[in-house]
């Protein structure tokens, strides 16, 4: 599989939390989405369970900041994961 962490760098943020997103692709990284049963202390989910996120949205979905409700941050992250996967499918980075 492609290196999704490298593929995420320099891309437009797909999380796009209103009032939080910095819109700066230079800060974008692969942000893993924490889901019960897929991660724990010191364990990240697989790279497919992630989204392209700017540093500000990444901080919010990882709850290092608390500008929006946690449930809304997770909703934005899951929508971002869907957008990220569609981008990578179209580019052939991942396969269906």
From Swiss-Prot:
Keywords of the record: Hydrolase, Metal-binding, Nuclease, Zinc
Family annotation (InterPro entries): YbcO (IPR010774)
Keyword Phosphoprotein: no
Domain of life according to the entry: Bacteria
Known EC number: 3.1.-.-
UniProt-annotated catalytic positions: 32 (proton acceptor)
Pfam families, A to Z: YbcO (PF07102)
Annotated residues for binding of Zn(2+): 13, 21, 54, 57
Keyword field contains Cytoplasm: no
GO molecular function terms listed in the Swiss-Prot or TrEMBL record: metal ion binding; nuclease activity
Role noted for this protein: Based on its fold and a conserved His residue, has been predicted to be a nuclease.
Note: Encoded by the cryptic lambdoid prophage DLP12.
Family indicated by similarity: Belongs to the YbcO family.
The protein's name: Putative nuclease YbcO
Source species of the chain: Escherichia coli (strain K12)
């Amino acid at each position: 599989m492609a290196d999704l962490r490298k593929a995420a760098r320099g891309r437009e943020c797909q999380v796009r939390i209103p009032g939080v997103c910095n819109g700066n692709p230079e800060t974008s990284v692969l942000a893993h989405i924490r889901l019960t049963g897929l991660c724990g202390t010191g364990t990240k989910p697989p790279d497919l369970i992630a989204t392209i996120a700017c540093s500000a949205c990444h901080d919010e979905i990882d709850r290092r900041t608390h500008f929006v409700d946690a449930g809304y941050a997770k909703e934005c992250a899951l929508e971002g994961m869907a957008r990220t996967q569609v981008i990578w499918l179209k580019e052939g980075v991942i396969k269906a």
